[in-house]
């Protein structure tokens, strides 16, 4: 990579994942990829050093497929980033809000800007990507078509921001995993760490309760727990879990020992510094 540091993301240039890359790793070159699988592959084959992978959103919930892709990729989670989602209404230069007739954006973003759609009486048109919608509005060159995307997408596509912060909720935040081919180099175990792991239990009464009992006993805080059926089977369930702590520190180490006793399989996907965002009120 000739000294150039590259971080890959899923989406078009100007996507919120692109913005997350630029804020989390200032000065790095961002590499857009079409899918999450291609984003992971870019790191795996050496085209990028890191991958920025959206994992959950405060309004839309979990991002699918990440739990299935990461274990098979041979990557490690080495960090996390929280990105505030601030939707902007974008139009071609010289256009105004009064010109707008059709609004283009990703379906999740469309559901988050119902207020502006109603206020302006716009016809919603669903597109594959927020930044992709901005590119299309630029290419069409019509004042009647506007896009909902980031301020970065406006900058990269030469569009005007007709109105900022058109999102209905101000607490719209996306959390990202930052993944690498190598595990994070960390200081000795102590406070301020997060651990992400997968584990599997049988669908039997009390199985999950027993598996997680050690967390409560050890005083370990669990911040995320997602369940997934395995390969279409109803006989076993896989869980993706984020917990506070380092697996070599006594509280979490004890909890993981108990978890391994009651679970069929356990795999740590990464140990990494907790984001400063977690300390915000």
Swiss-Prot record:
GO terms for biological process: L-phenylalanine biosynthetic process; quorum sensing. GO terms for cellular component: cytoplasm. Disulfide bonds: none annotated. InterPro entries: ACT-like_dom_sf (IPR045865), ACT_dom (IPR002912), Chor_mutase/pphenate_deHydtase (IPR008242), Preph_deHydtase (IPR001086). Keywords: Amino-acid biosynthesis, Aromatic amino acid biosynthesis, Hydrolase, Lyase, Multifunctional enzyme, Phenylalanine biosynthesis, Quorum sensing. Residues 196-273 form the ACT domain. Pfam families: PDT. Residues 6-181 form the Prephenate dehydratase domain. PROSITE patterns: ACT, PREPHENATE_DEHYDR_3. Pathway: Amino-acid biosynthesis; L-phenylalanine biosynthesis; phenylpyruvate from prephenate: step 1/1. L-phenylalanine binds at residues 207-208, 221-222. Gene3D superfamilies: 3.30.70.260, Periplasmic binding protein-like II. Changing residue 25 to S: Affects dimerization. Loss of N-acyl-homoserine lactone acylase activity. It catalyses: an N-acyl-L-homoserine lactone + H2O = L-homoserine lactone + a carboxylate; prephenate + H(+) = 3-phenylpyruvate + CO2 + H2O. Its EC number is 3.5.1.97, 4.2.1.51. It comes from the Bacteria. One of its GO terms (molecular function) is hydrolase activity. The keyword Lyase applies. Multifunctional enzyme that acts on N-acyl-homoserine lactones (AHLs), beta-lactam antibiotics and shows prephenate dehydratase activity. Acts as an acylase on AHL and hydrolyzes the amide bond of the acyl side-chain of AHL molecules, releasing homoserine lactone (HSL) and the fatty acid. Can use different 3-oxo-acyl homoserine lactones, such as 3-oxo-decanoyl homoserine lactone, which is the preferred substrate, 3-oxo-octanoyl homoserine lactone, 3-oxo-hexanoyl homoserine lactone and 3-oxo-dodecanoyl homoserine lactone. Homodimer. This is Bifunctional N-acyl-homoserine lactone acylase/prephenate dehydratase. It comes from Komagataeibacter europaeus. The lineage of its organism: Bacteria, Pseudomonadati, Pseudomonadota, Alphaproteobacteria, Acetobacterales. The gene is gqqA.
């Amino acid at each position: 990579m000739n000294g150039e540091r590259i971080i890959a993301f899923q989406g078009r240039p100007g996507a919120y994942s692109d913005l997350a890359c630029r804020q989390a790793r200032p000065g790095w070159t961002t590499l857009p990829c079409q899918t999450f699988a291609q984003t992971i592959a870019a790191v795996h084959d050496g085209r990028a050093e890191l991958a920025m992978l959206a994992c959950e959103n405060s309004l839309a919930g979990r991002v699918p497929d990440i739990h299935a892709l990461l274990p098979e990729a041979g990557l490690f989670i080495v960090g996390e980033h929280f990105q505030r989602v601030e939707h902007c209404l974008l139009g071609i230069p010289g256009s105004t809000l009064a010109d707008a007739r059709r609004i283009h954006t990703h379906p999740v973003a469309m559901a988050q800007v119902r207020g502006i759609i109603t206020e302006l009486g716009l016809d919603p048109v669903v597109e594959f990507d927020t930044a992709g919608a901005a590119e299309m509005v630029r290419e069409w060159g019509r004042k009647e078509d506007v896009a909902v995307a980031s301020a970065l997408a406006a900058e990269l596509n030469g569009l005007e921001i007709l109105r900022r912060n058109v999102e209905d909720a101000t607490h719209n935040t996306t959390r990202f995993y930052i993944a690498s081919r190598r595990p994070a180099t960390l200081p000795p175990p102590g406070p301020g760490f997060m651990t992400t792991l997968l584990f599997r239990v049988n669908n039997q009464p009390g199985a999950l309760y027993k598996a997680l009992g050690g967390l409560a006993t050890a005083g370990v805080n669990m911040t995320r727990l997602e369940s997934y059926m395995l390969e279409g089977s109803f006989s076993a369930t896989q869980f993706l879990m984020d917990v506070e702590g380092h697996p070599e520190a006594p509280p979490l180490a004890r909890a993981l020992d108990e978890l391994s006793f009651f679970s069929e399989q356990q795999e740590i996907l990464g140990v990494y510094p907790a984001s400063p965002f977690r300390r915000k009120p």
